[in-house]
Amino acid sequence: MNNDKNLVEIDDENLLFRVARESFVSEEVLAEEYEKIFDRCWLYVGHTSEFKKPGDFVTRTVARRNLLVTMGTDRTINAFFNTCPHRGATVCRERSGNSKNFQCFYHGWVFGCDGNLKSQPGKERYCADFITGGAGNLVPVPRFDIYAGFCFVSFNAEVEPLPDYLAGAKEYLELVSKYSESGMGITTGTQEYAIRANWKLLVENSIDGYHAVSTHASYLDYLKNINDGFSGAKLEGKSTDLGNGHAVIEFSAPWGRPIASWVPIWGEEGKQEIDQIYARLVELHGAEMADRMAYKNRNLLIFPNLIINDIMAITVRTFYPQAPNYMHVNGWSLAPNEESDWARKYRLSNFLEFLGPGGFATPDDVEALESCQNGFSNYRLVPWSDISKGMGKETANYDDELQMRAFWTRWNQFIGGAPTPDSGVQYIPTIALA
C-alpha cells in the first residue's frame, strides 16, 4: 500500500479525528493487517483453566493458523503448529480433550503431548538420531506466554515481552483474575458466529459506550418491564487509553453482576450469597477495590482483537477477518471456579440473553455493523468516518470515543508506517515497524 495515503487523519487543533472508510473495504489493507499486525502482535489463544492435567489440549485457529495447545507431562503449557512435520497433515482433528499422544492419520507418526516425536512406522530406515535429535518434532509457535491466566502466542520471534506489550491492560487482567480465590475458569461451550462486516467495526463496537441506549433499547426496556430487574445505578463512567492500542471503558450500570452486585429479581436467597461474596472481596482487597470489582463494569480491548466484556457476565471474545467484509467470532464465558449453581445459572443466563448470538445485544450489534459495512459501498463519495467525540477533554466519559482513537492511532502506526500523534498517553514502542 502507498504509505503516503492517509487512512487516519488527526486534527488536534480543530479536535477532529477521522478514519478513511477505504480501510474497511480494501483487500490491500486486509493483507497488510495480517502481515503487519496479526503476524507481529501478541494474540490470545486460550486460558490456563482449560489445561488441568497433562495431556489436556485445545485446537484453535489464530490468525489463519491452526494451532495445538497442550499441557505436557511436566505440566507446562505449550503451543505448536497443528501440522505434521512429515507431510503437513493436521495432527489433531479434535477441538479439545485429553491425550498423552497425538497420531497423524496420514503416515502414523506419533507425538507426545510435549510435541516430541515418539514413534514412526519404518523408523529403522531413518537416521539413528532422527527421533532423539528432534528433527521430527512438532514445531512450536515462535513465542508463547501467559499473564494472569490468559495465554498468548506471537508468530514474531522478536516481539517484545508480553508484560511490556500489555502495558496498562495488565491491571485489568489482574483484576479479573482476583475475583476468585480458587481461580477463574472457562465454562463449557463456545459461541461461534460470523458477521458480514469488517473486523475493526467489532473492535469499535465492543468498547463503544455511546450506542447502548439507542441500539440496545429493547434490552433496557426488558429489564425495566420485568419485576425488579434494575438496580438504582445509572449508566455512567470513563474511558481510558492504556497504551499500545489497548483501551477500556469502566462504568456503572443498572443490571446485576454475580460478582457481586445484587438486583431484586434474584431474591433474598441471592442477596445473602451476593453479600457474602462482597464481604469476602472486602476482606481480601479492601473496600475501595471491592466496590470497583462488584459495581463497575468493564469493556477491555487488548490490541488488536481480544475483547473482555466484564459486565453482567464475563465474555472473552476474539475475531478474525476472512475478507474485508466478513469475520469469524469466537466467545467464551469466564467464571469463578467455586461459583454456586445459583450464581452460575444467572451468569450463564446473562451470557446468553445479552451477549450470545441469539440474545438481546449481539443481534442488535451485528445488524448495526452489517449496516455500516453496507454503507461503506459509498466510500469513494462519502470517504470518512468520524471518531472525534470527547477530543480535548482531560477525562473522557465512557460514551466518548477516546478508546477507539487509542485503537486507531496504534493501527495507523502499523499500517501507516510512521508514528502518529498519540491520543493522551505517552507512546510505548512495541514491535519494530521497519
From Swiss-Prot:
UniProt-listed Gene3D superfamilies: Naphthalene 1,2-dioxygenase Alpha Subunit, Chain A, domain 1 (3.90.380.10), Rieske [2Fe-2S] iron-sulphur domain (2.102.10.10)
Textual note on the cofactor: Binds 1 [2Fe-2S] cluster per subunit. Binds 1 Fe(2+) ion per subunit.
Recorded catalytic activity of this chain's protein: p-cumate + NADH + O2 + H(+) = (2R,3S)-2,3-dihydroxy-2,3-dihydro-p-cumate + NAD(+)
EC number: 1.14.12.25
GO molecular function, one term: iron ion binding
Protein residues bound to [2Fe-2S] cluster: C84, H86, C104, H107
Keywords: 2Fe-2S, Aromatic hydrocarbons catabolism, Dioxygenase, Iron, Iron-sulfur, Metal-binding, NAD, Oxidoreductase
Cofactor(s) it depends on: [2Fe-2S] cluster; Fe(2+)
PROSITE patterns: RIESKE, RING_HYDROXYL_ALPHA
Presence of the UniProt keyword Iron-sulfur in the record: yes
Induction line: Induced by p-cumate and repressed by CymR.
Pfam families assigned: Rieske (PF00355), Ring_hydroxyl_A (PF00848)
Residues annotated to bind Fe cation: H211, H216, D365
Pathway of action: Aromatic compound metabolism; p-cumate degradation; acetaldehyde and pyruvate from p-cumate
Keyword Lipid biosynthesis: no
CDD domains (UniProt xref): RHO_alpha_C_AntDO-like, Rieske_RO_Alpha_N
Residue span, Rieske domain: 43-153
Biological processes per GO annotation: catabolic process
Quaternary structure note: The p-cumate 2,3-dioxygenase multicomponent enzyme system is composed of an electron transfer component and a dioxygenase component (iron sulfur protein (ISP)). The electron transfer component is composed of a ferredoxin reductase (CmtAa) and a ferredoxin (CmtAd), and the dioxygenase component is formed of a large alpha subunit (CmtAb) and a small beta subunit (CmtAc).
Family named by the database record: Belongs to the bacterial ring-hydroxylating dioxygenase alpha subunit family.
Function: Component of the p-cumate 2,3-dioxygenase multicomponent enzyme system which catalyzes the incorporation of both atoms of molecular oxygen into p-cumate to form cis-2,3-dihydroxy-2,3-dihydro-p-cumate. The alpha subunit has a catalytic role in the holoenzyme. Also able to catalyze the cis-dihydroxylation of indole-2-carboxylate and indole-3-carboxylate.
Protein name listed in UniProt: p-cumate 2,3-dioxygenase system, large oxygenase component
Organism field: Pseudomonas putida
Gene from which the chain derives: cmtAb
